[in-house]
UniProtKB/Swiss-Prot annotation:
Belongs to the SHMT family. The record marks 226 as: Plays an important role in substrate specificity. SUPFAM superfamilies: PLP-dependent transferases (SSF53383). The gene is glyA. It comes from Bacillus thuringiensis (strain Al Hakam). This is Serine hydroxymethyltransferase.
Length: 414
């Protein structure tokens, strides 16, 4: 397959080869990224990319869908088995579109929604004014406690009582602690609101039984299929059976046309992997590595939002190093460590600058990194940030990164 691409389009082939080289040679710590299996990539690069299949299994608007119907049913059934969901839609192209479909199912323009503040750990689609969610709906924000940096559930309840939202959104893109979904449902019930949980970052941990499952508590659960779930980039929706027809209509014909059947096939393969015993071991290793990395960073004198982590994600406050998140991201990338700048609770800097960096352990754990490697990564991060203007020190860091990544070859068949 690669040989065909190389002969047909040398420029695209070269860019893909360069990206493969980047992934092999750098330490990937972006919390929303992971490395899929070769089987997932094979499914996504299959002949299913040729097939249009508007509609759902058994009710398509095109002929010739008998085989893609099988694939979509496999994907849906596996998700039900993993999470205990009553109904599943695996067609969303992204987590953002999954969230949009839920909003379109139960909200009217201007309805009030309670969601987590973006700088406190929420997501753009949870009411940011630059996103469709903040434009179409009246979002009221809740956040974290100023000292503990954990969700203040009493504050959530108080705001829910005051504003009477039609929907409460739980879930986050930069919150390193366990979320109490049962408490959120109690709050939603008290004010007569629906509850939607966006579990995009923690879905793999939930699948492995290592994080509380939101499905028994939420009317709707949305997620991406990559991140800790280690599937292709995409989204899905899990919901109570009473909302099944509405959700399906919101996706098609509501906001999407034909589903990406090659991606759904890749999702199905990833869900099959998540059902294996070794996936639970993998997820436990993600958490163990995150805890070890957090401990190492703190020993090096770095400040962590909330003081640590319960999941795969760590948020570093770099202000005591007298640098910005933007500078930290750049200098770490220069030595071969990939992270992303990120706002922190009660942020004062621009989102293009930020006071923090977000890191995660899903990708390095997929690659085989263990606890001792987390010690070295913590040392490397601290050494690099503390010496960000010292070229000799940065060159030493580059060599240490190269020595570490060389121990863990990846995608050797490509």
């Amino acid at each position: 397959m690669v040989d065909h691409l190389k002969r047909q389009d040398e420029k695209v082939f070269a860019a893909i080869e360069a990206e493969l080289g980047r992934q092999r040679s750098k330490i990937e710590l972006i919390a929303s990224e992971n490395f899929v299996s070769e089987a997932v990539m094979e499914a996504q690069g299959s002949v299913l990319t040729n097939k249009y299949a508007e509609g759902y299994p058994g009710k398509r608007y095109y002929g010739g869908c008998e085989h893609v119907d099988v694939v979509e049913d496999i994907a849906r059934d596996r998700v039900k088995e993993i999470f205990g969901a009553e109904h599943v839609n695996v067609q969303p192209h992204s987590g953002a579109q999954a969230n949009m479909a839920v909003y379109f199912t139960i909200l009217e323009q201007g309805d009030t929604v309670l969601g987590m503040n973006l700088s406190h750990g929420g997501h753009l689609t949870h009411g940011s004014p630059v996103n469709f969610s903040g434009v179409q709906y009246n979002f009221v924000e809740y956040g974290v406690d100023a000292e503990s940096h954990r969700i203040n559930y009493d504050d959530v309840l108080a705001k829910a009582k005051e504003h009477k939202p039609k929907l409460i959104v739980a879930g986050a893109s930069a919150y390193p602690r366990v979320i109490d979904f049962k408490r959120f449902r109690e709050i939603a019930d008290e004010v007569g609101a629906y509850l939607m949980v966006d579990m995009a970052h923690i879905a793999g941990l939930v699948a492995a039984g290592l994080h509380p499952n939101p499905v028994p508590h939420a009317h709707f659960v949305t997620t991406t299929t990559h991140k800790t779930l280690r599937g292709p980039r995409g989204g899905m929706i899990l919901c109570e059976e009473q909302f099944a027809k509405q959700i399906d209509k919101s996706i098609f014909p509501g906001i999407q046309g034909g589903p990406l059947m090659h991606v759904i096939a890749a999702k199905a393969v990833a869900f099959g992997e998540a059902l294996q015993d070794d996936f639970k071991t993998y997820a436990q290793n993600i958490i163990n590595n995150a805890n070890r990395l957090a401990e190492g960073l703190q020993k090096e004198g770095l400040t962590l939002v909330s003081g640590g982590t319960d999941n795969h994600l760590i948020l570093i406050d770099v202000r005591n190093l007298e640098i910005t998140g933007k500078v930290a991201e750049h200098v770490l990338d220069e030595v071969g460590i990939t992270v992303n700048k990120n706002t922190i609770p009660f942020e004062t800097a621009s989102p293009f600058v930020t006071s923090g960096v977000r890191i995660g352990t899903a990708a390095v754990t997929s690659r085989g990194f263990g606890l001792e490697d987390m010690d070295e990564i913590a040392s490397l991060i601290a050494y690099t940030l503390k010496n960000h203007e010292n070229e000799a020190a940065l060159e030493e860091a580059r060599k240490r990164v190269e020595a570490l990544t060389s121990k863990f070859p990846m995608y050797t068949d490509l």
